[in-house]
Amino acid sequence: MLLTTLLLSIGELRSSNSTARHHPALQHKKAKRLFKRQGIVVPIVVDEHHRIIDGHLRFQIAQDLGIDALQAIVVSKATPAEVIELELALNRLAQDSNWDEARLKHK
């Protein structure tokens, strides 16, 4: 698997029809508010055909906000199975973590 980072125009990006995650309206609203204030600071991940592997919500909000381009990590020379594994793993990682309540009190 080969990884490169590019700035891709919104028009070059392709939304995947196979995304396994659903983003509720409240999550979309919160993320949009954050991205308006801070910008989209995490690159999306795409395959060599610029189909989104990870970052559908960021892509949707970029469209909503009229953002012209996004930083993207392009995954090439990956098998279809590797792409599916990457998509599922990236979407699952945060779900499997817990907050450290003691540390949150100091933030």
Regions found by a protein language model. Give the residues of each.
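Short, charged/polar connector segments at secondary-structure boundaries
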Residues: 1-107
